[in-house]
Amino acid sequence: MISTTSTRSQMEATPYEVAQAALIKWGAFMLSIYVIYLLVFPLTPTIYREDHVLEIEQMLRHGRKEFAKFYVLGLFGLFYAYWRVLRTVHSLSREDPEAAKSLRVWVLGVGILCAITLIGLYPITALDVVLYVVRARLWALYDASPMLAWPANYPQDPYIRFAGEYIKEPSPYGPLWELIAQIPIRLGILDIAGGVIAMKVITLISYIAMAVLIGWYARQETSRYRVSGLTAMTFFALNPLVLIQAIGNGHNDMVMLALITLGLVLWQRDRWAAAAFAITLAALIKISGLILMPLFGVAMLAAAPDWRTRILRGLGMASIFIFTAAAAYRVTGPFPEVFLGAQHALFDRWGYTPAYATLVVAEEIFQYEGAVKEVIANAAHLLFILYYVYLLIRVAQRKLTLIQAGFFAYLSQLLLGTTFRIWYPLWLIPFAALELNSRTYWRTFLFSITAELSILMYLIVWRWKLDTWDWGLNGPLKPYWHYWTVMTLTTAPWVFGIPLLGPLLLKWKNSRKFNTSLWL
């Protein structure tokens, strides 16, 4: 009798109830993994135990190596649960669009619960958030602009030791971020753990704002894929890369991306001046936000009905950008010195990209000398510029929308840049969420997985296995068995190859389905 009743209730469940139950089940699964991560890697007291910041490998090497397996399995579990939820909500959106709207609050609630849990997580795979606090203290306590000052110049500060390898570098971030970051310090949050939590709260607020913008206010650029606000918001809000990197590691990219999303939503509503202001603010958080500005300018001019309107809007946008940027940078220091940190970050850092892999092959294997580094860097930059000009032309011709061109621009920056960090694929998400199709979904999804797992390769796999592997040390690859050579030539193909080739294989398998729907 009980079995019959249960079967009947399942048969009578509405699509909304089925989707809600799946969300609760998989949401609880995701939350449980984040809670376990929190228990193993708590922010406090971990941050007080050492005189420097710790990487995940350093936290596991003594007596806890077995947990590395669980960490990896946990990541796969998180991405699997995320994929299951995304499929469920997309199915509901197609079957009952009105009911799907009611599930947005539930999805956002699950995301916020996971995010709040991760506020207490030690930043295990990226330590930038600790640097935010150190640099904010320079300004708030010592009246030294982090855009100019080195942490090394203030040895009296008890937390300067956390600056690590960046102790003799000015801030690479924009002035707006440095203005925001010092607010918690000026409010009296002087402890290092409290400062880290405050920075994560800032990213949490940005995360919620971006989720609301995507779920309630944005619209899809192309209607034929039948993607709802619920699906788009789920794509963003439950992505493990977003939650771990933006909240768990507290990256200020989240603030930049929320402002970019605001700018795109305003653009969709023909509020070009407000959109220009929001995108300018995004570029003043991180210089990478600047990539969108020329595309926005061309899209705005192309959409204007006549030349008089184009001239007026062009002058208006230029005024908004120039005066806002000049005012923000002027507060942080004199020109051009305030740009030194960003310049160093853009042009002097290398690592784990196709360009850097090319450099490693040239220098380590073929023993090229001289200006090979400059040649490769210039070639990569030139390729990006040429492709970017192509995108500008396509936008001017109205063959690409701003959102489509933005996705391609940031994707090309990931591929052609000279440096890569595991949270950089976050840059794709605002554009993918507002133009969600098989191509943008799979590129972003696969990039999220390969990036999140890549740090384990060059921290754990190398240090625990490959560094002491007898075949590598004494075999035919002995002359090349060095950290940068081995890790770059294994990590770069993994991180970039899978997101590039994966969608092509799906398209080859079923081109019609790939091109006409969101194939999950």
Language-model-detected regions and their locations in the chain:
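Specific aromatic-rich, kink-prone transmembrane helix
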Residues: 209-213, 244, 255-271, 410
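Loop-to-helix entry region of an early transmembrane alpha helix in multi-pass inner-membrane enzymes
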Residues: 67-72, 175, 179, 189-209, ...
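Intramembrane catalytic core of multi-pass membrane enzymes that act on lipidic substrates
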Residues: 99-200, 204
